[in-house]
Design a protein with these regions (language model features):
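Serine-dependent amide/ester hydrolase catalytic core
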Residues: 1-65, 118-123
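Structural helix-boundary/capping segments
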Residues: 9, 68-124
């Protein structure tokens, strides 16, 4: 794909515009400071010999809309599922970074969901 192709650039701008308007509408119409959603699904074990090709992962990212819009998002630890970490993401309007950081920090302090990983030795 040619990244300078006018059709591609137009589609990119259209996707950004639609994403921005949908996020703005959701925040304004519902009088929200932020949208909170689970981050990607739980972490997965990686094949230590062959690496990770991502084929074992089945999830839809909650951060896609904010990323396409160019809007801020922050993810913090939310806990563990089957011993694997999961996160929670906060998305906001354009230039709402200070508010999102404050919300994410308050969530972290209240839940204390983060814990140091338990490292195990791996035999070759």
């Amino acid at each position: 794909t040619n990244l300078n192709d006018p059709a591609y650039l137009e589609a990119l701008q259209q996707a950004k515009s639609i994403s921005q308007s949908r996020l703005d509408e959701a925040l304004t119409d519902n009088q929200l400071d932020a949208i909170v959603a689970p981050s990607n699904g739980p972490g997965w074990l990686i094949d230590l010999e062959n690496g990770d090709d991502g084929s074992s992962v089945n999830y839809v990212s909650s951060s896609g809309l904010a990323a396409i819009a160019g809007y801020p998002a922050i993810t913090v630890p939310a806990g563990y599922i089957d011993g694997m970490p999961v996160g929670i993401s906060f998305f906001g309007a354009a230039f709402s970074e200070p508010q999102l950081i404050a919300l994410a920090f308050a969530y972290e302090q209240r839940t204390q969901a983060r814990r140091a990983p338990e490292l195990t030795s791996v035999s070759p």
